[in-house]
């Protein structure tokens, strides 16, 4: 069942009529991206192999129009972008993911931004895959 938050987002920022990357009115794909922007996107390979981490997924490479939108999401209060970015995130089927743990923000940074973009993104990924989110598992101690 669609959450109230998602229904509100659909009313304000409807899927299907405006590209979330270039803001042009155009036919968009299931990720909310027009054909022109789609050709510029580089999806990150999933999963990434990092020796010291059991598993890690990234939706998009931080380049081109995606980099600008990621900055807007993190620093300009454009919370609605979380659902678009979540659409690009894929959890491999062979992973037995029990919980999604967002990276916390230091309280100073949280006060500056007004929200934790990682927690918001994890909410949409949780809805996509039906995996619970635990925002209390990690604590940010040092402001980096």
Q: How would you name each of these model-derived features?
A:
Residues 1-144:
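Glycine-rich phosphate/pyrophosphate-handling loop used in enzymes and phosphotransfer proteins
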């Amino acid at each position: 069942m669609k959450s109230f938050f998602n229904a509100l987002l659909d009313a304000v920022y409807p899927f299907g009529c405006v590209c979330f990357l270039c803001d042009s009115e155009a036919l968009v794909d299931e990720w909310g991206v027009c054909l022109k922007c789609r050709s510029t996107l580089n999806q990150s390979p999933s999963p990434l192999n990092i020796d010291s981490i059991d598993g890690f997924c990234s939706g998009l490479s931080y380049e081109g129009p995606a980099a600008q939108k990621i900055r807007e999401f993190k620093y300009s209060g454009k919370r609605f972008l979380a659902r678009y970015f979540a659409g690009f995130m894929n959890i491999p089927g062979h992973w037995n993911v029990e919980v999604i743990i967002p990276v916390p923000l230091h309280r100073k940074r949280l006060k500056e931004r007004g929200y934790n973009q990682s927690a918001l993104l994890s909410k949409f990924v949780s809805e996509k895959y039906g995996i619970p989110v635990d925002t209390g598992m990690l604590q940010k101690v040092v402001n980096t």
